[in-house]
């Protein structure tokens, strides 16, 4: 017993002694964490260079766009062929994907040889061989008559400009077929298939094996966004933000980047850590000076690295008593599989003895211990280097997401990772030290990258079909110039019907006379009250207008809420609430005494018989108060003031908010004679010649016409451009069948149109993984402000996702892109339709005056126009295109329509004074 313990102690001492000697001898291969962190920094810089348009041509890490934009979402289905070429053998698979109830994938595959004479021959020989194997595979399965989609895993660096094209940059590993570098491998394969003529194949996607691995694992774990191969060769890919990829148009979404990290160091950036053995390996390789990182870490070279170290140590008398055999000197006699066998925990030393004996040396126990430690140092260095480069990718992903802690999955494949007994454990341990703020799950790719090629093909098929259906749906929102000219023509016709006495009663665009006959001339003076009612908030203002050399307008205002129960209660309750708010304001300003002139901005369709009388035609924008329609709103206001018995007011004018906006802007800019509101609702007004206003006596001068254009289309004249979604929104609105034009362009409804489209797309499985949340079912959830935020060019998709999450919608990156697209299509149509209406107005003014060219200013207000990032630009462009003879300027009303009501009151008081004198 004691003898055995002594022997064990002696052996341990001996082993420790040998280990120390080897550590000293191979000191340059032992990398500290400090060195590894430095390598991470270098690789991060190389990644940045590869993604940059300016630096990519000279970058060693090519960061190739793969045009794979999406990982599987579980809804893929179909029958696919996958080809897998890139390693020691060539595999063909038939992959049947079914997503009914349980996702399942049925695969059958066959492995074909790729002999040396083929991989080192001509390109046509290589692809003829691939086509022949594919023919054999299809023949055996009786599927030659089916034109199945094919995914092609081609594990070499390729330049892609689309998913079904791959131009080979350079051969790696043992491949050297001539005439292929610089050519599109899809064309070469198609040519070989066509030459045979006995079957047809549709090559949908070419992917790198690393991308294939990511996609294979992505089918099982949708958090998988990195692919890693550590086998014969080594490489990694990951999902990069498109905005960082200079080589590809667009900045929405993500794309898988094939890093081709095997070439890291080809520019000399790793010279300080390369050893004499690395240089010797490189000199004897098929591609000297290339793939230097791969030659330090991949399975193709580790065995050879160990052999070179053993030869040198033997020559120096440090091993095998200085004996060198012909076998030990022969390249390829010591493989990476031997390294794996020697590093096994229990039988490693026994395996070392067997392998070394096979090489003709007669190893001592010392020799076996030394060789085992050489293998450990070489494979450990590989694991450390791969951990450093993967760590750089994980840090980039974390930064892209703007998250303090990254949670992600890495799909892994490759013989070295899978079969080496210690590799994965060491690799994971080093990675955890290098990136402590990342939680990484490693998912082993059980079925290789062939299944991944099929998944890429399945995803491409799914996305193509989805894209077709999405485009088909959204095409109904695209308006051509001819369609917009037709809308302009119809608006013009409806305007004429509204102006004529004979047709006015049946006209949908009411063209209501406002009895505002002039815009301000600058001589207005005095203190005026203004009320502004038109939405959920109600404003009371005190406006002090001063004329003279320096004209000034000083305003004080207070905002009051109108509860929904009052909006939809009785008319008496509504006007009592308004008067109560006025009373509070007069107290607040300390002016509850003199009888002040008041202008009332009332933003609903009214038939006016004078400046201070307006009969409500219909409620809009969610108001439903009873006993108001058909009544004079000024009388209702005066009655409520009398009921309160606290104060009296001189109600001089009732005006629409659009007219108020025009007057506000006309005070600043005399050429302003059109008003436009595009906010919660939409409307326009303009100065019409009195001779055309048949509803009012007199032919001299002008009068502002409140168009009430929101009702355009209520007679069915826009039915050909209204979509299924417009009809849905109308059907469930408070005023079904009314204000149809407004429901296509105003802020109150755009979000609802978007919501209905999103529900439809979710039902079809295009969004939110097919799950319709309670939030999405909630009417009114998509406020216009969210549309404006989502469409902002400044917002990255992460922020779009954050907005959707605020709304209770958990979206992927792809979901966010589609939501943004839908918002864009809906708001663009709104801006174009609004522009077509405005074009009809300005052309009418021009023709009224018999002008070749008209210069006119439009005063504009409304949240949609003000806040939406693209609405105003698209609307202006549309007006310009549809009315080329009008030079139209747009002036934003900064002070709302309340100031306009005060100005109309001031003009009214001035005209009244002039008339009495």
Curated annotation (Swiss-Prot):
The keyword Nuclease does not apply. Residues 208-447 are annotated as: Hexokinase large subdomain 1. D-glucose 2 binds at residues 603-604, 620-621, 656-657, 682-683, 708, 742. Changing residue 445 to L: In NEDVIBA; no effect on the affinity for glucose or ATP; no effect on thermal stability. Hexokinase is an allosteric enzyme inhibited by its product D-glucose 6-phosphate. Hexokinase activity is inhibited by N-acetyl-D-glucosamine. Pfam families: Hexokinase_1, Hexokinase_2. It comes from Homo sapiens (Human). This is Hexokinase-1. It comes from the Eukaryota. D-glucose 1 binds at residues 155, 172-173, 208-209, 235, 260, 291-294. D-glucose 6-phosphate 2 binds at residues 532-536, 657, 680, 861-863, 897. Monomer. Interacts with RABL2/RABL2A; binds preferentially to GTP-bound RABL2. Interacts with VDAC1. The HK1-VDAC1 complex interacts with ATF2. Interacts (via N-terminal spermatogenic cell-specific region) with PFKM (via C-terminus). Interacts with SMAD5. It catalyses: a D-hexose + ATP = a D-hexose 6-phosphate + ADP + H(+); D-fructose + ATP = D-fructose 6-phosphate + ADP + H(+); D-glucose + ATP = D-glucose 6-phosphate + ADP + H(+); D-mannose + ATP = D-mannose 6-phosphate + ADP + H(+). Residues 16-458, 464-906 form the Hexokinase domain. Residues 656-895 are annotated as: Hexokinase large subdomain 2. The keyword ATP-binding applies. Keywords: Acetylation, Allosteric enzyme, ATP-binding, Charcot-Marie-Tooth disease, Cytoplasm, Disease variant, Glycolysis, Hereditary hemolytic anemia, Immunity, Inflammatory response, Innate immunity, Intellectual disability, Kinase, Membrane, Mitochondrion, Mitochondrion outer membrane, Neurodegeneration, Neuropathy, Nucleotide-binding, Phosphoprotein, Repeat, Retinitis pigmentosa, Transferase. Residues 521-655 are annotated as: Hexokinase small subdomain 2. GO terms for molecular function: ATP binding; D-glucose binding; fructokinase activity; glucokinase activity; glucosamine kinase activity; hexokinase activity; mannokinase activity; peptidoglycan binding. Residues 1-10 are annotated as: Mitochondrial-binding peptide (MBP). CDD domains: ASKHA_NBD_HK1_meta_rpt1 (cd24124), ASKHA_NBD_HK1_meta_rpt2 (cd24127). Its main location: mitochondrion. One of its GO terms (cellular component) is mitochondrion. Residues 73-207 are annotated as: Hexokinase small subdomain 1.
